[in-house]
Each structure stands twice: as C-alpha cells, then as structure tokens.
Swiss-Prot record:
Ligand binding (Zn(2+) 1): 67, 100, 163
Gene: dapE
Keyword Metal-binding: yes
The protein's name: Succinyl-diaminopimelate desuccinylase
Positions contributing to Zn(2+) 2 binding: 100, 135, 349
Signal peptide boundaries: none
Length: 376
C-alpha cells in the first residue's frame, strides 16, 4: 500500500485538470471507493464535476474534502520537469497539483481503503466531497454540493480538508479555522479636466487619498486567542486616462479584509462607509463576502488529529487560523467541525511544484490513524 499512495498521486497528476476541468480524476477515485463499499453520486453543475461518495449512514459522519482541479502551469519551458509528468526524482514527486492537492487526495483514498479493509464494521460513516472548482470561482463546486446535502437533510459532523497546511515539516501546522474574507469595490467620482486648470476639475485621487490613509491605519480589532487582528489591504487602484495632462474623472479602488471572529462583515461595511462619508466623497461601493470566519476548537476532531500526528511523526502540532480561504468555509457554515491538514505548502502554485514522497506516505498514515481514533 505504501507505493500505492505514490502511484495514485502520479496517476492523478498526469491528468491535466486545470480548473474547472477534472480530466477523469474523480472517476479514477470513484472506482476505487466503490470497490470498498462507497455509494457514489456524481453532481455536475454547469462546468464543474463534483463527487459525493459515502459509506454508512450513521453518526459520527466523517468527511474527507478536496479538489481535483489545479491552477495553470504558466510557461511549461520554465519547469525543470514537465508539469503533468508526475515524475519522482530524488525523493520528490513533481508536477502541478503534487502539493495542492492531488497528493492529499491519494493519501486520503489509500488511508480509507486500508481502514475499511481492517474495520469493515467501523462506527459511523465516511464520505468524500470532491470538486473541480476550488481553484476557480468556487461557484459550482463545494458550495453547490453542500446546498444539495442540506436540502435533503444530510449532515456532516466532522470534515478534514486536505489543503497543504504544513509549513516547515509535515504535520507542524493544522488549520483549525480560517479568517473571513470581504472584498470592497470603491468608485469615487471627481470631475475630469486639464492638469493646468485644477480649479476647473476635482481630482478623485487627491480627494480619496486621506480616506485610504485612514482606512489603512485603522485598528479594526485586536484578534483573540485563535485569530490575529483583522487586516485591511488595498489590492488595486485604477485612475486616469493614460494621458499625462488629464485629471481623471473617477478613481477605482479594490480592497480586502481578512477578518476575525471579533467583528462581522456588516460591522466592517458600516465602519468603512462612515469613514468615506466623513471625507465627503461622492462614491459608490459594492461588496463581495468571500467567506465567513470559522473555528474548530478542541474536541473529538482536533484531538484525534493532534494525537495522530504525534503518533506518526512525533511532533506536537500547532493549531493556526492564518492564511487564505478554502472550501472548508462552505462546510463549516453547516455546523460541521472542520480542520485542514496536508503536506508542506512551500511550492504550491509555483513553477516546479513538488512534494516529498516520504511526506505523502506519512500523511497517508496520519489520515488512517485519524480514522482509527474517531471510528473504532
């Protein structure tokens, strides 16, 4: 079974599943899950293939979640090894998706095969929620599957998302929550004119700069035991016609909050509007809530995971909520306990993405031990 983890990861990498394509990855997994007693349900929404596979109907219901889609490779000539080769060299498995997250998918599947073979009458239920829309707009993937499950009253109790959570060594970090993400799109109106006649124009860049300074210097909260303080970052500023002698008529600013559980997205929106109004700006502002913050505190899932990592690696893991968002946010909103555990993330989305074969083998052992801790 040890070599099987690597072989399966290679086979998945060799399928060019650039988001939202699945390229047959889910079928490969489904065939093996069905062989060990899982009921398979394929859910296709618009351009996205999703799989819901479940074995058992009882609680506790433990779910492995992940994605088969990968980000584009960029120019393949920049890669040391072809990005869809799945080549193993010097103890590293190379290819797009090796770390994010086809390696995790292989480890989940093989761990589950081992577990159900040893424990055909295990407690509770095991499921897999797999999508090909995590790296894309996340419209027709996990969120649609969750909607389907909720509509028929199917509840996940605990979920492990295989995102690459580890930092320096396998298992050193488990994400037991994530910050919320809120994006604002601001348009400030001015009056276009000639730069030599500023008295006849209103420069929206000049008008907006003090407000942006205040927003960037505002302390939104102080975080808490589990979350760092909420952060505000400006990501894009666009103004001007391209000509050097024209005062622009409007300014567009895009910004993002990564927010803790100490503040709500509504409170952030209200505070931003109050600041903009204090500066007497003529503006339009729209918002996208990309995800709400979630937190899984110590309990069966976290404790089983910490214990498994210690057993396999000898490490005492760190529980963190830093980093970006993941599909875990859609699952957590149902009340499920959610964590993220996967390989090291140093090469994700980069040229020459790779993962240690030893790490994948150990990750499979950790996943299997988590199942042992929870369902036997």
């Amino acid at each position: 079974m040890t070599n099987d983890v690597i072989a399966l990861a290679q086979a998945l990498i060799q399928r060019e599943s650039v988001t939202p394509e699945d390229a047959g990855c889910q079928q490969m997994m489904n065939d093996r899950l069905q062989a060990v007693g899982f009921n398979i349900e394929s859910l296709f929404f618009t351009d996205t293939l999703n799989t819901w596979a479940r074995k058992g109907t009882q609680s506790p219901h433990f779910c492995f979640a992940g994605h088969t889609d990968v980000v584009p490779t960029g120019p393949e000539k920049n890669w040391q090894y072809p990005p869809f080769s799945g080549l193993v060299e010097n103890g590293l498995l190379h290819g797009r998706g090796a770390a994010d997250m086809k390696g995790s998918l292989a480890a989940m599947l093989v761990a589950t095969e081992r577990f159900v073979t040893k424990h055909p009458d295990h407690k509770g239920s095991i499921s897999f929620l797999i999508t090909s829309d995590e790296e894309g707009p996340f419209i027709n993937g996990t969120t649609r599957v969750i909607d389907t499950l909720e509509a028929r009253g199917e509840k996940i109790d605990m979920c492990l998302v295989g995102e690459p959570s580890s930092r320096d060594v396998l298992g050193d970090v488990v994400k037991n929550g994530r910050r919320g993400s809120l994006t604002g799109f601001l348009t400030v109106k001015g009056i276009q004119g000639h730069v030599a006649y500023p008295q006849l124009a209103q420069n929206p860049i000049h008008l907006t700069t003090p407000a942006l300074t205040e927003l960037s210097q505002t302390v939104w909260d102080h975080g808490n035991e589990y979350f760092p303080a909420t952060s505000f970052q400006i990501s894009n500023i666009n103004g001007g016609t391209g000509a050097g002698n024209v005062i622009p008529g409007e300014l567009e600013v895009q910004f993002n909050f990564r927010f803790s559980t100490e503040v709500t997205h509504t409170q952030l929106q209200q505070r931003v509007n109050a600041i903009l109004q204090q500066h007497n700006l003529n503006y339009e502002l729209s918002w996208i809530v990309n995800g709400q913050p979630f937190l899984t505190e110590h309990g069966p899932l976290v404790d089983a995971t910490v214990k498994a990592i210690k057993s396999v690696t000898g490490l005492t893991t760190n529980l963190e909520t830093t980093g970006g968002t993941s599909d875990g946010r859609f699952i957590a909103q149902t009340g499920a306990k959610v964590i993220e555990l996967g390989p090291r993330n140093a090469t994700i989305h980069k040229v020459d993405e790779c993962v240690s074969t030893d790490d994948l083998i150990a990750l499979c052992d950790i996943y299997e031990q988590i199942l042992e801790n929870l369902l036997t």
